[in-house]
A protein has these predicted regions:
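Short, low-complexity disordered leader/linker segments with a strong preference
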Residues: 7-8, 26, 30, 34-35
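Bacterial N-terminal signal peptides
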Residues: 17-29
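Transmembrane beta-barrel domains of Gram-negative outer membranes and organellar outer membranes
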Residues: 35-288
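N-terminal secretory signal peptides that target proteins for export/translocation
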Residues: 1-15
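Residues at the start of alpha-helices and the adjacent loop-to-helix junctions
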Residues: 11-13, 27, 201
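Short alpha-helical segments used as structural interaction elements across diverse proteins
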Residues: 10-11, 29, 245, 276
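Enrichment for repetitive, rod-forming helical segments
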Residues: 10, 20-21, 102, 255
């Protein structure tokens, strides 16, 4: 028990160091007056995955009904810094997802995992970090799009929290913004290219359609379910949630913020996967 507590404490320190590093980096980058923008402009930029705006979202996902008995709850906090760079007529949008994962104790893990004994206890730590670069035209048009490479880095601090594989593949996003709507979709396909031979290969599709309806005073309705397919699974490949929620653009002092809350029900789910999910997001906005 003491050894386990020391391991969890060590994992927590690593995560705190990561958060401190991200925070310090962003503080140095954004240590200047925030550009004034209207609430309408901020909402449009916050809802556009390839907008040329610095931002720091903290997205917390609660997954209920996981495990063989569908009575356990997992949690994933995604730290997702967005850094845009303009090069000539193009914007290069760097989007990072660093997941901090709590996985409850389960009698068995996913059927593709060989080391079933690892799921007899709970795990908390850093998962695999995803890094995506979108190349998007800097000139505005009715159809906004971006395309580029995506990489999954084997950074997990515990075996059940990651794939142990370096994976890569294409990513793309397309959207249109006929006021007051923002409608689009994001897609990514990853394949493992390097990693231990005793761990399952990775071939995973991620599809995220999103619809936003903007209203007065920064309020909006949103639906952005994350649909995934594990092509390596022999059955129950799809995770298909449906749902949505609401959000608001606001300011704390001079700092623009974006907060949202969504709830989802899973109409299809992998073996031992979730039955429902709640997603809460708080996003710091740094207009240029």
């Amino acid at each position: 028990m003491m050894k386990r507590e020391r391991c969890l404490a060590a994992d927590l320190r690593k995560i705190l160091y990561l958060g401190a590093t991200v925070g310090l980096t962003l503080a140095l980058m954004f240590g200047r007056a925030v550009a004034e923008q209207s609430t309408e402009d901020l909402a449009a930029a916050a809802q556009n995955p390839v907008a040329a705006m610095y931002s720091l979202p903290f997205q917390n996902n609660i997954y209920g009904g996981v495990g063989p008995q569908h009575n356990s709850t997992a949690n994933v906090l995604n730290i997702q810094p967005v850094i845009p760079i303009t090069v000539g007529d193009w914007n290069i949008i760097s989007r990072t997802i660093a997941p901090i994962i709590y996985l409850p104790s389960l009698s068995t893990g996913p059927s593709e995992i060989v080391e079933q004994s690892l799921f007899n206890k709970s795990h908390f730590g850093l998962g695999d970090i995803n890094q995506t670069f979108y190349f998007s035209p800097a000139k505005a048009s009715e159809l906004i799009w971006g395309i580029g490479p995506s990489f999954n880095l084997p950074t997990a601090t515990a075996t059940p929290l990651g794939s142990a594989k370096f994976s890569m593949g294409p990513a793309a996003v397309a959207l249109t913004m006929p006021k007051p709507w923002v409608i689009g979709t994001l897609v990514r396909q990853l394949w493992s290219v390097i990693g231990p031979s005793d761990r399952p290969n990775v071939s995973q599709l991620l599809l995220q359609p999103f619809v936003n309806y903007n209203m007065a005073e920064g309020w909006y309705l949103v639906s952005s379910p994350i649909i995934t397919a594990n092509w390596e699974a022999s059955s129950n490949r799809w995770a298909l949630p449906i749902g949505g929620g609401f959000g608001k653009i606001f300011r704390i002092g001079e700092q623009p913020m974006n907060a949202s809350l969504q709830a989802f029900d899973y109409v299809k789910s992998p073996t031992d996967g979730p039955r429902w999910a709640v997603r809460a997001q708080l996003q710091f906005l740094f207009p240029r």
